[in-house]
Amino acid sequence: MPPFRIFLLSPAHCGGKRADLLLSERAAFPLAVRLRSTPGVTLGEAFSFLSGLYFRGKLAYAERFARPPAGARGVQVITTDRGLLSGDAPVGVEDLRKFGTVDISQDHPAYRLPLERDTKLLRQVENVEVVLLGSVATGKYVDVLLEIMGERLLFPTDFVGRGDMSRGALLLRAVRNDAELTYQPVAGAIRRGARARRVSVEG
């Protein structure tokens, strides 16, 4: 088993009511105020607000179980137009607005090319497993990542058949119990399945 592990987190949706609330110039809650100031907030903070339980679970889980080699980032977030960024990367209002204008599709060069660039750099790191914490049922992330990473691209087996909220609860419970999930290669996996039993954070 490789001694190192890096997690790739799918992004939060940068549109909708929560994005409108966070990006509003009238918003007075602390995160929104910091977002409008320099240097802004971290990408992890912004996406945790936008996505709620699911991204919060992904971030907490990845931070707990990442085992990166020296000089590598153990937690990397897929973005719509900037490839892979650290969860600690600073972002401001304009960054989030731009994220919301780019479609996540392998047919969209603004999304695909930066992600290909950074994934190829990641492939050069030896003896590392890469775990995708995101949907594998569609090709929006997998089609780009799998072509480059091949058998080294893994995902949590228990993600199959779960929706976003259930995955978030599963990940937070794993962190609370200090129990890492089982992974399997994306290549050749059954990526859709019957709906899994609902999981609570406390359960």
Description of each model-found segment:
Residues 1-203:
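Peripheral peptide segments
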